[in-house]
Amino acid sequence: MPLNMNKYLTDAYTGGIIKKYPEDFIVEEITPEGIILEVGKSIEFKDEENWKGNYIHFTLEKRNWTTLDAIREIANRVGKQRKHFGFAGNKDKYAVTTQRVGCFNVKLEDLMKVKIKGIILRDFQKTNRKIRLGDLWGNRFTIRVREPELKGKELEEALNKLCKLKYFLNYYGVQRFGTTRPITHIVGRFIIERDWEGAFHAYCGTPLPYDDKKSKLARELVDEENFKEAYKKFPKAFFYERRMIKAYIETGSYQKAFMILPPYLRCMFINAYQSYLFNEIINRRFEYGFEPMEGDILIDNVPSGALFGYKTRFASGIQGEIEREIYERENLSPEDFKIGEFGSFIGDRRAMIGKIYNMKYWIEDDSYVLQFCLKKGNYATSVLREFIEKKD
């Protein structure tokens, strides 16, 4: 089940390697007010005069941490649960990233004492508001591409052509599906079909080439249904796999094993399946181009595609035909997206092309650096694929 990303806007490419080191991929959050949270730079955020003592915001700079793991570790250090913390969006793990984080009922002096390798907390602000998912304008990306296949004048010509791109195909990037284990959408499809056993084995079992030796052995044991031994063999870092296996051993129910996951993680599986089908919608629309056509539903004057749910708003015209054909092929119905206690998924629409802001590059030795800004919800890897993937 590939990730449905196979169309390109140009025939130019440079080749190359990204993320050799975390410092090669810098993600700096841009606040709703347009402030770029620059790596290594302190910014003053003024305290609210009528502070009621509830919320504190801070900038989290992290290296080689997921956002969720970083916040979980910070919460542990200050003696609070993760639910006391809020953030606007997840940032890449194998990268250097910045973002604002809000916390409730946490003492400032406790936050200021936190010292964790790869994590810096700064720019504290006393405020009366939460930070919710989506509370950002977007992100600035500074990405080093190492060992490009093209050199000298050829490289410069390709970069000049590619950097003229104003838009990109707004695919959901590989992070949506799992960078090392791109199976999240497969789990989601099993859940939509109410095949809880298949979903359990896809998530906890099903060894893949990039799995390390210990987790690969544990996943093989899951597929053999030797769950007690699999639980012992999974490294403790595989927190959710271990919890799910334990829940299955205790209850004998694959569905109940999924219910021990936090709501945001349960949502992730269905969202990934929706995203997988959305990527296919882009591929199907590609042959018609992305100029608005009769029947399109526009977002910011750009044609949008469906993220299927229990209240899917279909386009009409050619775009509507594409969406309904995929929906019917998958044997979907509104009720499929109402999954009881697991969650309900209303559906949405998403622009099929995204705008690139302030794109520039510079060449250094055997690498080049790209810098650009994207609005929230857009993936840098969907821009990068135009640069580094060979277009056959």
Swiss-Prot record:
Catalytic activities: uridine(13) in tRNA = pseudouridine(13) in tRNA
Domain TRUD: 167-354
Uppermost EC category: isomerase
Biological process terms in GO annotation: pseudouridine synthesis; tRNA pseudouridine synthesis
Record CDD domains: PSTD1 (cd02577)
Keywords: Isomerase, tRNA processing
Assigned EC number: 5.4.99.27
Record's keyword annotation contains Isomerase: yes
Active-site residues (renumbered): D92 (nucleophile)
Disulfide linkage: none
Pfam families registered for this protein in UniProt: TruD
Molecular function in Gene Ontology: pseudouridine synthase activity; RNA binding; tRNA pseudouridine(13) synthase activity
UniProt entry tagged with the keyword Transcription: no
Membrane-spanning residues: none
Function: Could be responsible for synthesis of pseudouridine from uracil-13 in transfer RNAs.
NCBIfam families according to UniProt: tRNA_TruD_broad
Membership in a protein family: Belongs to the pseudouridine synthase TruD family.
Official protein name in the record: Probable tRNA pseudouridine synthase D 1
